[in-house]
């Protein structure tokens, strides 16, 4: 290559690379402006519709007559039923007060009341008979399904050996007893909100390093001594983006079992090597990264609006954010989701049948984050959004600490004195929240490096979707969100072409470096086999 050619290419590299950097800075500038306007809109939204932040209000103690192990807690309007288990010893008969206490919750304190609300004669007969005929009876928990309250008791050695008392929850917050034959109605929802697809024989690719093709996007195998996940359909190479050892080194491709679920940018994988338990992984196509997460064996739930996947110890977003929390408890099953009235916050509840533990995970669709999970043995939510929960003591006690948090999980939206002609009021809180969430997704994309697959194409698509979906986006009352969005779209469109130029430059530079390195390596090899009488001959040899 001539000196002039080299100089020209270097100048082009600097020019085109500089243009690309200018576009990146422009995107960042418009992103900063979008943040300012979103914050202004959020403040205005809260003034109109009100806002409830998650904060610790107080801690109180529920006091019981006997030493006991707390089991669960349930709110009925402003009343609260507390369930527990007392060591009976030589006591011949179990009374209702040996298992339940009733409290009125006011002023962040619990005030004991009579058990009149559940002193139904038919229920009392069934209750006494249960303790008479089943020696190892223990109260487990409350659950509410379709306006019915279920009191669940364990009556045998297995966790599936249960007796369930069913109550109808009346509109006036009273309870009407139904029966003790409803155990079959108490079951958890589907633990996967997607279907695992098993790979078929026609997905196998034979070769020196055979693998199974997952929709021609991902390639997996358990041969050659390790489990490998690849992103190239290349059976001549055994290298991939992720690998870990398997127990049986000599297994064939047919010996393993492979399952997958297509979740957009994410692909969930369930791979069972020969004579081993299944291993679980999540692949992100945008970042081309793999994370192992064996808690997927227990359950996995979709986040709202296609944001990604949540499980009992973490979550994985479509945009690549992955978070695993320290509290990892195997065997947690998905029980329910609770949605705030404005659609901004989602509470995901996971339950462990053997240990009677709950994990509560609150996800905010605007911030697209899960706050620190709550691990507890019992929880309940009052209509005003006050969440009460407790951790059971290891030893029986008369005093049980209850933490009380204010949360956005109210029964109804906060009531504010607002002008019904207010433009934001006419739009509606949920619509604004959804638009803000989509704008925050754009902001997350702006933080990505250009190694993120199709980054600028995604920015163009996302900004176009927001601009086309919300008629109010260009109004002054919503702070003209369309302006920074249009600028981001314009800059991203330009960046697509410029980034292709930069990629070509980088690839060309990479090839030149590889070529020069190869020549240098050959030259150094020759010098080892050649004798030089003086330094001038050595320098001349290198120059040629």
Feature annotation, model-predicted:
Residues 340-341, 364, 428, 534:
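Helix N-terminus capping/helix-initiation residues
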Residues 21-24, 28, 33-36, 71-93, ...:
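Short beta-strand elements that form the blades of beta-propeller/WD-repeat-like
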Residues 33-63, 92-129, 159-203, 225-251, ...:
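Surface-exposed loop/turn elements that mediate protein-protein interactions on large endomembrane-trafficking
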Residues 6-8, 17-20, 24, 31-32, ...:
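Short charge-dense sequence patches
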Residues 2-25, 52, 65-71, 78:
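Long, compositionally biased low-complexity segments enriched in polar/charged residues
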Residues 137-140, 255-256, 375-377:
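Catalytic micro-motifs at enzyme active sites that drive phosphoryl/nucleotidyl and oxygen chemistry
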Residues 66-68, 132-140:
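Signature of short aromatic-glycine-proline-rich micro-motifs recurring in repeat-based ectodomains
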Residues 406-544:
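Amphipathic alpha-helical assembly segments used for oligomerization, scaffolding, or translocation
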């Amino acid at each position: 290559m001539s000196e002039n050619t080299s100089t020209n290419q270097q100048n082009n590299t600097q020019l085109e690379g500089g243009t690309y950097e200018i576009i990146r800075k422009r995107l960042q500038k418009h992103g900063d402006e979008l943040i300012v306007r979103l914050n202004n809109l959020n403040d205005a939204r809260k003034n109109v519709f009100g806002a409830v932040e998650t904060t610790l209000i107080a801690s109180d103690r529920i006091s019981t007559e006997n030493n006991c192990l707390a089991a669960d807690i349930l709110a009925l309007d402003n009343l609260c039923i507390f369930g527990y288990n007392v060591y009976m010893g030589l006591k011949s008969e179990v009374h209702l007060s040996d298992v339940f206490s009733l409290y009125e919750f006011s002023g962040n304190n619990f005030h004991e009341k009579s058990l009149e609300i559940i002193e139904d004669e038919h229920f009392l007969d069934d209750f006494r008979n249960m303790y008479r005929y089943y020696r190892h009876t223990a109260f487990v928990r409350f659950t509410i399904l379709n306006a019915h309250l279920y009191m669940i008791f364990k009556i045998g050695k297995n966790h599936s050996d249960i007796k369930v008392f069913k109550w109808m929850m009346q509109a006036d917050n009273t309870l009407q007893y139904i029966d003790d034959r409803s155990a079959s109605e108490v079951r958890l929802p589907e633990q996967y909100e997607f279907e695992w697809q098993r790979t078929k024989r026609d997905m196998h690719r034979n070769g020196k390093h055979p693998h199974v093709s997952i929709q021609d996007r991902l390639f997996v195998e358990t041969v050659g001594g390790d489990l490998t996940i690849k992103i190239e359909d290349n059976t001549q190479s055994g290298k991939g983006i992720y690998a870990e050892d398997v127990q049986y080194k000599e297994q064939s491709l047919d010996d393993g079992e492979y399952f997958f679920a297509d979740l957009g940018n994410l692909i969930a994988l369930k791979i069972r090597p020969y004579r081993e338990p299944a291993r679980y992984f999540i692949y992100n196509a945008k970042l081309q990264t793999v994370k192992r997460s064996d808690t997927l064996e227990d359950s996995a739930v979709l986040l709202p609006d296609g944001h990604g996947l949540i499980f009992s110890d973490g979550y994985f977003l479509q945009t690549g954010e992955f978070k695993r929390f320290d509290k990892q408890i195997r065997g947690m099953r998905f029980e329910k989701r609770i949605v705030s009235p404005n659609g901004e916050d989602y509470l995901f509840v996971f339950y462990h049948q053997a240990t009677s533990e709950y994990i509560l995970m609150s996800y905010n669709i605007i911030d697209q984050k899960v706050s620190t999970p709550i691990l507890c043995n019992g929880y309940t939510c009052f209509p005003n959004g006050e969440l009460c929960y407790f951790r059971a003591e290891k030893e029986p006690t008369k005093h049980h600490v209850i933490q009380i948090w204010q949360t956005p999980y109210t029964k109804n939206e906060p009531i504010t004195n607002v002008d019904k002609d207010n433009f934001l009021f006419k739009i509606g809180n949920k619509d604004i929240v959804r638009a803000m969430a989509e704008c925050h997704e754009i902001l997350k994309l702006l933080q990505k490096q250009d190694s993120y697959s199709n980054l600028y194409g995604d920015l163009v698509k996302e900004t176009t979707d927001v601009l086309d979906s919300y008629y109010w986006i260009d109004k002054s009352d919503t702070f003209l969100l369309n302006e920074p969005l249009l600028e981001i779209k314009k800059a991203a469109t330009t960046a697509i072409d410029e980034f292709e130029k930069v990629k070509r430059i980088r690839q060309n530079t990479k090839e030149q470096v590889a070529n020069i390195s190869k020549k240098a390596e050959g030259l150094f090899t020759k010098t080892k086999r050649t004798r030089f009488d003086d330094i001038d001959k050595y320098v001349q040899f290198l120059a040629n």
